[in-house]
């Protein structure tokens, strides 16, 4: 599996693209504030999911990047609230994007609570030579031995 196959990534990418399209309609004066911020945070959700999955051989890094992704997802929701309050998006769009945002948050939290289902093997990480070799073999082949 590759990170693009992860449901959290797919859903996060989908909402980031929807936000991009919606934000094209924001006023020009918001270009370097709300528009830039909401695009950046929504894209960062996916970037952090990708990084966490690629670095899943390091359990702490996996966890750290997923918590960063969750924080970016919350930031995106905050920007959606501002866009709605400023009347840049209508209520229907706000509700749809909010529901999708919540779903992405749940998927990220599922990954955080179930790291083994995503290939994180914490039993490998004791400081000895055998595990160091195994860790580097996993990185080289991009697969975890069964």
What are these regions (language model features)?
Residues 1-48, 55-146:
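Short, C-terminally biased terminal segments at protein or domain edges
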């Amino acid at each position: 599996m590759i990170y693009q196959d992860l449901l959290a990534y797919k859903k996060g990418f989908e909402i980031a693209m929807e936000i991009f399209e919606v934000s094209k309609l924001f006023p020009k004066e918001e270009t370097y504030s709300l528009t830039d911020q909401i695009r950046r945070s929504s894209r960062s959700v996916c970037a952090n999911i990708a990084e966490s999955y690629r670095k899943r051989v390091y359990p702490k890094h996996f966890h750290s990047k997923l918590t960063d992704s969750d924080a970016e997802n919350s930031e995106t929701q905050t920007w959606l609230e501002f866009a709605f309050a400023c009347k840049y998006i209508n209520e229907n769009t706000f509700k749809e994007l909010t529901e999708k945002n919540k779903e992405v948050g749940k998927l990220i939290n599922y990954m955080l609570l179930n790291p083994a289902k995503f290939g994180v093997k914490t039993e490998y990480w004791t400081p000895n030579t055998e595990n160091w070799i195994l860790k580097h073999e996993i990185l080289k082949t991009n697969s975890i031995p069964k």
